[in-house]
């Protein structure tokens, strides 16, 4: 998801998406640790999405 799309969402929607992504990151980490993760690029994508959401939440908090 692009940062511009994230900026149009409300804080509640962003927090819900953040919780969802943190759960997804946990699942991917467990799969990687057990050697079951085939598409390792997903870890990077989820980590980046989490960072983008946190950045937008910080921007909204400053407004």
Curated annotation (Swiss-Prot):
The keyword Ribonucleoprotein applies. InterPro entries: Ribosomal_protein_uL29, Ribosomal_uL29, Ribosomal_uL29_CS, Ribosomal_uL29_sf. Keywords: Ribonucleoprotein, Ribosomal protein. GO terms for molecular function: structural constituent of ribosome. Coiled coil: none annotated. PROSITE patterns: RIBOSOMAL_L29. Pfam families: Ribosomal_L29. GO terms for cellular component: cytosolic large ribosomal subunit. GO terms for biological process: translation. It comes from the Bacteria. Belongs to the universal ribosomal protein uL29 family. This is Large ribosomal subunit protein uL29. It comes from Aggregatibacter actinomycetemcomitans. The lineage of its organism: Bacteria, Pseudomonadati, Pseudomonadota, Gammaproteobacteria, Pasteurellales.
